[in-house]
Each structure stands twice: as structure tokens, then as C-alpha cells.
Amino acid sequence: MSEVLLFHHALGLTSGVLKFADNLRQAGHKVHTPDLFEGNTFNSIEKGLAFIEETGFDEMRERGVRLADELPHDLVYAGFSFGVLPAQKLAQTRPGARAALLIHSCLPISGDWSFGPWPNGVPVQIHAMDNDPFFVGEGDIDAAREIVETAEDAALFLYPGEEHYFADSSLPSFDAEASALLTRRVIEFLQRV
């Protein structure tokens, strides 16, 4: 059994994110789903990002990082899109990280947005669609490839399509087939880490 800290995307803690967490729980894992937006949800990425900007991206990320202080160190850190910011920071900087799951997004491990190199002994999976304009168009795919090239246990899974939030069952962008495959891969990953 793994213990997972799962951070939501820029639309908030939606029922689709909670459903994903429930799927992991049904497979025998303990999953924490903090609400960084304190109950607020949004119907567009633009509105969600505007909400984040009001608080500040750094502060919102650090809010997630601080939540980990109340939990054990040997966690799997997971994030959907915006939630990758605190998840990846924790996986790269908090001692004892068990693994990382980066879904719909990935930060570089070198350059301005970096938290440093990928840590030894921390397995990672990265999941996104191969024509997602955010993941592909904004450089996340390059960051993911850099992690896969340098980390000892890393995998990038690309699914056919262009939807950003394809794994959130509560949204019109949901892709049932891709999401089912992602969920299966994640559960298999959690069984071995």
C-alpha cells in the first residue's frame, strides 16, 4: 500500500479528481486530497488561473507544500496540472519521497522554473496527451523528456488526443479510454513503489 498526496488542478477539487482518488483507494492505497482553493471550483482554466493569480502562484504552491508537514515523509506526491507544482516540488525537495505522479503537467529540472535535478531513488511517471496545447505547446513535454533521460526510474506516457484535463471524469474533456489506461498504469506503479 502506498500513501498518496494528490493535488488538484486549476479548476479546483472537482468530483472527477475525487473519483480518481477513490479509484486509487479501491486499489488499496491511502489518498489525501487537500483543497487548496478552499471550496472554490471553476468552469474554465482561465478563471481558475485568475483565482490562483489573486493569491499568487508561489503562495498557492507553498500552501500545498505546507500541507505535507502534517503527513509522513514516505509519500507518493501526485498532481493534476497546476497540482504538479506542489507535488513536483515536494518530490524533488522533501526527504523521503517515495515516488511522483505528474499528470497533465511537468516542470523542468534545469533552468528558471527548476527545483534542481531529479532526486536519486524517486520513481516518477508523467502522463499527458500528445497534442495537449498546454503540455506540448508550453514546454512541459521537453521537461518530461529531460526527466526521463536523467532519472533512474522515470516514464513518460503520451495518450492520443489534445485534451488537457482528460483524466477528470467530471469535465467535458474527459477521455474514458485514456483515463482508464492512465489509472491502470498508476495503480501498477503504486503497487511497486
Predicted regions and their residues:
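Serine-hydrolase catalytic machinery in alpha/beta-hydrolase-like enzymes
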Residues: S2-P72, F166-A167
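C-terminal catalytic histidine-bearing segment of alpha/beta-hydrolase fold enzymes
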Residues: D153-V193
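Gly/Ala-rich beta-loop-alpha elbow adjacent to hydrolase catalytic centers
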Residues: G79-G83, A87
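Short beta-strand immediately N-terminal to the catalytic nucleophile in serine-hydrolase-like folds
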Residues: Y77-G79, I103
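A conserved short beta-strand
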Residues: G96-L107, P123
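Conserved alpha/beta-hydrolase "acid-adjacent" motif
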Residues: P133-D142
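Short beta-strand/loop motif that positions the catalytic acidic residue
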Residues: N120, I126-A128, Y159
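Conserved strand-to-loop "acid loop" that flanks and positions the catalytic carboxylate
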Residues: H9, Q125-F134
